[in-house]
Amino acid sequence: MAEEVNERTRLLSQSDDPSPSLEELEEWEEPRNWKVSYRWLCIAVISVYGLISPVIAAIIVPAMPQIATDLNVTDPGMLQAFVSVYVLGWSFAPLVVGPLSEVYGRISLLNTGHGLFLVFNALCAFARSDYELLILRFITGAVGSAPLSIGAGIIGDLWAPEERGLSISLYTLGPLLGPAIAPITGAYIVSHTSWRAIFAWCSLYILITWVVGLCTLRETFRPVLIQRKQAAAVRKGQLPGSVQHHHKSLADVFRQDLRRPFTFLGTQPIIQVLSLFMGYLFGLNHLSITTFESVWTDIYNQTPSRAALNYISIAGGFILGSQITGSLNDRIYIYYTSKDPAKGTPELRTILMLPAALLVPTGLLIYGWSAQTHSHWIMPNIGIGIYALGLIMSYQCIQAYVLDCYAVYAASAMGALTILRSLLGFVLPILAPLIYRTLGYGWGSSLLALWALVMGGLVPILLWRYGAVLRKRSGILEEM
């Protein structure tokens, strides 16, 4: 009996009909039915994976003077590029890794990427010229981006929609918290050793987490688990030898899977809107991180090591916002669905984006104008903390919305978001010196706050009003 191969599972050839028990997972095999403690262990490991890549993006900021001296770098733009080109690397790998994880599985690609991440980050410590370091930083960013695209898919594999809030809060905390704590760590290392030691210590961290991941993580993607179950049954003779799980040719992978993020970005208005908004937030975060130290060294005349301690305010805002959003997101979802399960739509994730739309610009205004007027040092810290709280609220709501909409293809959807997210994360920090030099911290932050208010207000309103209609008209979502 011929059956059409399901695009999401790609399990069998079209001419075979295996035992029904092998077409599905047993209850105990379902990732969402695994022990809660183990599922949280998986989330913790991928969150730790996701933390180190953003840390390495910003940890060299306090080491810029040493790098400039050691590698004879005289162009400030080149120093800024050491950070920006790393972020640019994030925009490429997820376009490949995300779709491939939906063909070959999440964990194998995640661990392979982390191993390559270890190798190229270690090589950065041996760079002898600015261009060597620039190229190695780009490659390191690319291979280190796997957790940023695959992690959301793993959360969707392990948790039901009403349970995802806290896991998303933990997972998204790392990529945003990393750049905030990185300068503190980098300043400490540089003050005691050299900039090359930064890469050595980070490589040690990557090695330890990689070993932990290899020992603890197992595949979570349901279609791949079914494929492996059927392949094992064939090897054991429990299925006829003619029954083989479907293997895609390399041409099929390129034609169907690797183009999926571009298809999402080109045909899905939801992805287009959210990628612009998320890209702006991501770029804004890296702009703030890379210029934050100069506020304290240039305006408040603090030493680099003392200036780095002010990043605690950013970290505090991220941690507080993460915990608030994770808990409230689940409570809001459960509240609406307990009355009517049909109300359990992705649009519930946009509710918390509205208060976040006020927090981000408010924090930026307090931060920028207090720095401009040389107010007490606590005021810029309060402002940047409020901004960080609102930013992570928006960030987590976007992740949750996309995950609810594109559960099966979550990794590809995140890959589509990554394109503009990383490009703006690359461009905005480069423009930061021009913005603040031309407008000052007050008006420069006001300009950034205005865009944050407009986008932060419009996006949740548009999705709440038209999100269901757009999802209904989406041909991709109809196939899922």
From Swiss-Prot:
Region (Disordered): 1-24
Protein's UniProt keywords contain Membrane: yes
Compositionally biased intervals (Basic and acidic residues): 1-10
Residues that span the membrane, as ranges: 41-61, 81-101, 107-127, 138-158, 170-190, 197-217, 264-284, 308-328, 351-371, 378-398, 415-435, 443-463
GO CC term (a single one): membrane
Alphabetical UniProt keywords: Membrane, Transmembrane, Transmembrane helix
Pfam families: MFS_1
Gene3D superfamilies: MFS general substrate transporter like domains
Record localization: Membrane
Low complexity composition-biased segments: 11-22
The keyword Transmembrane helix is assigned to this record: yes
Identification of the protein by name: MFS-type transporter oryF
Organism: Aspergillus oryzae (strain ATCC 42149 / RIB 40)
